[in-house]
Amino acid sequence: MAGAIIENMSTKKLCMVGVALLLLQVLAFLVGGLIAPKPTTYVNPVAMKCIDVRKSHRSSKWLMPWGTEPCKSIQSFDEAANRLIEANDIVFAAHIPNSQFEMSPWFQFMLVVLQLDIAFKLNNYIEDHSMVTLDVAVAYRDDLKEEWKELARSVEQRKLNCILPVDKTVANEGRHYDCDVIPLMELGSVSHKYYLFNIRLPVNERQKMNIGIGEIRDMHVVSIFQNGGFTMVWFAMKTFLTPCIIIIMIWYWRRITMMTRSPVLLEKVIFALGISMTFINIPVEWFSIGYDWTWMLLFGDIRQGIFYAMLLSFWIIFCGEHMMDQAERNRISIYWKQVGPIAFGSCCLFIFDMCERGVQLKNPFYSIWTTDVGAEIAMAFIIVAGICACLYFLFLCFMVYQVFRNISGKRSNLPAMSKARRLHYEGLIFRFKFLMIITLACAALTVVFFITTQITEGNWKLGDLSIELNSAFFTGIYGMWNLYVFALMFLYAPSHKHYGDGQSNDGAGMSSGEELQLTTTITHIDGPTELYRLAGKEAQE
């Protein structure tokens, strides 16, 4: 009688496989913790206040804060007032990166936010619900001697969320407000070496444009991007893991197709999980180094969403197939109540992503976080997603408990057998329970990773620039997913061992009567493992 490798492999060999996987898991964490730098970094240049007295402010001239032809600048708005320079003639110019440095495609993306230094004045304070209007123009070039080329231009409105930490008195004039950062734009690729931002704050008293926004002293143009060193480590992991998963996936399915019976649902789902893991592994990001693929962020989110949906569905089906009787199992339609919400949630996440990153493919200045309603909806969406992830984990724990109880109940219904055979089944049950505990640990870390990434993205958009993601957590979780999928396909592949009347996997004998009784009890059910067949045995009361 043949089963899966997890049941027929000797304890010594199984322990060796487990130790090897554990060492690889530790290595995945160490790669991020000891080799890779932190995933993201940022530059924070202070914009130069340039003077532009041309009648047509929207002409093709670009104002540089430094270089061979720097703009004429002022130090403060008081100087502008003394020189009778109007606010409409002042342009905040910022160059990214700082001098003597270059941007690189290895940075993958660039998120730009503004940090305003606003001073309190009794005759010029920030009014409630004030909006700031930004006339933004962005240019790029790949050589310091080239002319600037326009990348994007738009007039955007952003809400000012500022708090004055002291009383509004004459004595506190000049004190700065505590303001949230203002999301400006997001680029899905960093394909050019130099970027130039020219930002104007147009004033129009008749239209109440930029009135009641306080006295702006300085503007910080903060650029957040992926660390190039982390990108190299990430690409290297993907390049190494992709062929490993493809090879084990082909080997697994070849063994399945060599069997006389057709594959059962559990085996198909394991194979589908391998496909989704391969989809997220394939390092197509290498092409983003040479091509300006601005859609890579959206494509990466879609790949990760497909894998999440497949992984969560697999855990539900994996537990369910070890709970149901043979008459109910092996049909995907049975799981519509559990898999349906996962599919619906994945579609909601896709729509949410398309509403921001999809629109940003045409308008990089668009952000759902720029309005009160949009920010509240986005934050509520993140909170609900986190709550749903926690509820899913609790439900999975309940299903695992049900599986354990079902296996124990079915085991008690087996006919009396020899001590050696009972020990054999005790060993199988122990191995299965250990795998289920590993599954729960995997699920817990996946939920934590999902919530962490969602909160982190919210912090980027809402202004918490002090957060530092742990590279070891990223590489460790990514390695864990691959090792888990690899282990499933290896351990649940059909074994080539067949045990006759005189042996078992531990070398223990069994009488022909006992073998006949056991065979008629559970082996008429198709399935990858003995425990799978045992769990689906129909009650004979």
From Swiss-Prot:
Domain of life, source organism: Eukaryota
Transmembrane feature ranges: 16-36, 233-253, 269-289, 304-324, 332-352, 380-400, 432-452, 472-492
A GO cellular component annotation in the UniProt record: Golgi membrane
Presence of the UniProt keyword tRNA processing in the record: no
Keywords, sorted A to Z: Cytoplasmic vesicle, Developmental protein, Golgi apparatus, Membrane, Transmembrane, Transmembrane helix, Wnt signaling pathway
Broad class of where this protein is predominantly found: Golgi
Topology in membrane: Multi-pass membrane protein
GO MF terms held by the record: Wnt-protein binding
Lumenal side: 37-232, 290-303, 353-379, 453-471
Residue ranges, Cytoplasmic side: 1-15, 254-268, 325-331, 401-431, 493-541
Cellular localisation: Golgi apparatus membrane; Cytoplasmic vesicle membrane
A biological process from GO: pronephros development
Family: Belongs to the wntless family.
Role summary: Required for a subset of Wnt-dependent developmental processes, in particular, eye and pronephros development. Regulates the secretion of wnt4, which is required for eye development.
Name of the protein this chain belongs to: Protein wntless homolog B
Origin species: Xenopus laevis (African clawed frog)
